């Protein structure tokens, strides 16, 4: 077990505290925008976004009329989101979480692995969007995360899962995730369809130093089950 598996929460809290958040995007994720139309959206749609940070993807969902429920460990990230986007909110204290509640958006400050404890407090959701949660977790924690999400997601939940695949195992996030791993961790209940794969043009120097020569952005979809 590596250091991140034993102290994953502190790793992410430190990165937010030190503003080491180069993963934050200035525009909605290109694969979310490209494949959003594949989701079955209606007036009551609610999207769960684990480890949401201050992602602008949340604004994209809101702009499409989809309510958002986020889970985020770093309170600094949550405050940044509401401040940067001038969204009014109220704060509600609960057991195992602190809730920042705005119009059509709720973000729970909590350890993602406390999700089963607070699941009954969440609005009913029909979409799970995962851009940065699964690939942020080391291998053992990804297995536990998948098991937990299967427990809290309704059977007909639509899932849009964005991951990365590398040609060399990485020691820091974002981690490489293969289709074989997803089948192993989710196949009991979830059947993912690979809908996109794009090779990254410019691999960061620190990845090249690890011996990495190829990276791919891969997108998986699990449609609503009827």
Curated annotation (Swiss-Prot):
Q: What is its EC number?
A: 2.1.1.67
Q: Cross-referenced InterPro entries, in alphabetical order?
A: SAM-dependent_MTases_sf (IPR029063), Thiopurine_S-MeTrfase (IPR025835), TPMT (IPR008854)
Q: Which UniProt keywords apply?
A: Cytoplasm, Methyltransferase, S-adenosyl-L-methionine, Transferase
Show the stretches that span the lipid bilayer: none
Does the keyword field hold Nucleus? no
Q: Name one Pfam family in it.
A: TPMT
According to UniProt, the reaction catalysed is: S-adenosyl-L-methionine + a thiopurine = S-adenosyl-L-homocysteine + a thiopurine S-methylether
Which GO terms fall under molecular function for this chain's record? thiopurine S-methyltransferase activity
Q: Which HAMAP family match?
A: Thiopur_methtran
**Family under the similarity heading:** Belongs to the class I-like SAM-binding methyltransferase superfamily. TPMT family.
What protein does this entry describe? Thiopurine S-methyltransferase
User: Organism source for this protein?
Assistant: Francisella tularensis subsp. novicida (strain U112)
């Amino acid at each position: 077990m590596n250091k991140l598996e034993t102290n994953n929460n502190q790793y992410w809290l430190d990165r937010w505290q030190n503003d080491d958040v180069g993963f934050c995007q200035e525009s909605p994720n290109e694969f979310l925008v490209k494949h959003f139309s594949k989701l079955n959206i209606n007036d009551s749609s609610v999207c769960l976004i684990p480890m949401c940070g201050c992602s602008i993807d949340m604004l994209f969902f809101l702009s499409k009329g989809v309510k958002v429920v986020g889970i985020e460990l770093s309170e600094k990230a949550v405050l940044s989101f509401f401040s940067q986007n001038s969204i009014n909110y109220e704060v509600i204290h609960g057991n195992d979480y602190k809730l920042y509640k705005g119009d059509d958006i709720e973000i729970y400050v909590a350890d993602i692995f406390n999700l089963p404890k607070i699941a009954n407090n969440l609005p009913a959701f029909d979409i799970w969007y995962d851009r940065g949660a699964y690939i942020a977790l080391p291998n053992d924690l990804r297995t536990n995360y998948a098991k937990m999400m299967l427990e809290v997601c309704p059977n007909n939940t639509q899932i849009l899962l964005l991951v990365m695949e590398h040609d060399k195992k990485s020691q820091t996030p974002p981690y490489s995730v293969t289709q074989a791993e997803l089948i192993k961790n989710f196949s009991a209940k979830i059947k993912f369809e690979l809908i996109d794969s794009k090779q990254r043009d410019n691999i960061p120097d620190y990845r090249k130093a690890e011996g990495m020569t190829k990276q791919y952005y891969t997108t998986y979809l699990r449609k609503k089950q009827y």
